[in-house]
């Protein structure tokens, strides 16, 4: 049984969440808490294996509770987030503090049943995926310098693709800020996120701490060199080239591998545009998204990198790509920025 702690200031919401979780035969709610202070106390006392927690609570809010729990008893935490801009900022802050995932919380109790399947699946996946919280916390401690490159390829069409899921926002903060502002490539980031303001806030955060411009991708916008584009949550991102102009297409299609955006969906078009002038990186995450796509990049003589198991929060996606024979180089996340720059140098300078 997966021992779970439920934290919410509403007694009705706690009961509803408890009922949803315990509808699964492999999940047991071993306790509840009505604020962050009780959550910290019950975590130390009851030793849950997964925590489901709201952000906005009295006495101690969810963000403060995440921070406190990570200091004493780091375990997987799923946060509830609203669809508002404020909610998306809070969700990303929770991820930076050590929470592993979040779920958008319905506005009313009558809507709560709509997230039952997602909630049960996420609790189950976190428990079964060997999530390494210590690695996530260690990511936050490392502060690397910008890696500069030596290149001269003003007319070359170079593309970088990065795929990530669980633990991805913290991993991206170890990569994007260390890429130089004169990088002669366009960067495309596919981070599994739900629809809402989450990816725009992630882009704003990365843009504020990076030399590169980082933005949420918009439909039909022209792709520029030296810009990193993040796929909007809940939509697929494709890259199309016509009459020597490369543009982004944002599509509300069907999920692939149960996710949208999907790395594999983006790769299908990315590899047609960039081919052997591409560098692709698969970071932390559950599942197999990216494995088949990276194989196509590899077969097109593009360069592929996977994050090493010892620096992954969840090794699912990199492991799947490695086992598919789709990866050229496996590197610790702290070495990936330099590896990207060196690979771009080779493709740019023709060495």
Swiss-Prot record:
Annotated SUPFAM superfamilies = CheY-like, Methylesterase CheB, C-terminal domain
Question: What cellular-component terms does GO give this entry?
Answer: cytoplasm
Q: Which residues carry this modification: 4-aspartylphosphate?
A: 54
Q: Which UniProt keywords apply?
A: Chemotaxis, Cytoplasm, Hydrolase, Phosphoprotein
Q: Where is the Response regulatory domain?
A: 3-120
Report the NCBIfam families cross-referenced here.
Answer: PRK00742.1
Which purpose does this protein serve, as stated in its record? Answer: Involved in chemotaxis. Part of a chemotaxis signal transduction system that modulates chemotaxis in response to various stimuli. Catalyzes the demethylation of specific methylglutamate residues introduced into the chemoreceptors (methyl-accepting chemotaxis proteins or MCP) by CheR. Also mediates the irreversible deamidation of specific glutamine residues to glutamic acid.
Q: Which residues cross the membrane?
A: none
Put simply, this protein is called: Protein-glutamate methylesterase/protein-glutamine glutaminase
Question: Which reaction(s) does the protein catalyse, per the Swiss-Prot or TrEMBL entry?
Answer: [protein]-L-glutamate 5-O-methyl ester + H2O = L-glutamyl-[protein] + methanol + H(+); L-glutaminyl-[protein] + H2O = L-glutamyl-[protein] + NH4(+)
The record ties this protein, via InterPro entries, to: CheB-like, CheB_C, CheY-like_superfamily, Sig_transdc_resp-reg_Me-estase, Sig_transdc_resp-reg_receiver
SMART domains to which the protein is assigned, alphabetical: REC
Q: Which PROSITE patterns match?
A: CHEB, RESPONSE_REGULATORY
* Compartmental location: Cytoplasm
- Where's the active site on this chain? 165, 192, 289
What UniProt notes about the protein's domains is: Contains a C-terminal catalytic domain, and an N-terminal region which modulates catalytic activity.
Q: Which cysteines are joined by disulfide bonds?
A: none
Q: Give yes or no: UniProt keyword Hydrolase.
A: yes
Q: What is its EC number?
A: 3.1.1.61, 3.5.1.44
Per the UniProt record, the source organism is Methanococcoides burtonii (strain DSM 6242 / NBRC 107633 / OCM 468 / ACE-M)
Q: How is it modified after translation?
A: Phosphorylated by CheA. Phosphorylation of the N-terminal regulatory domain activates the methylesterase activity.
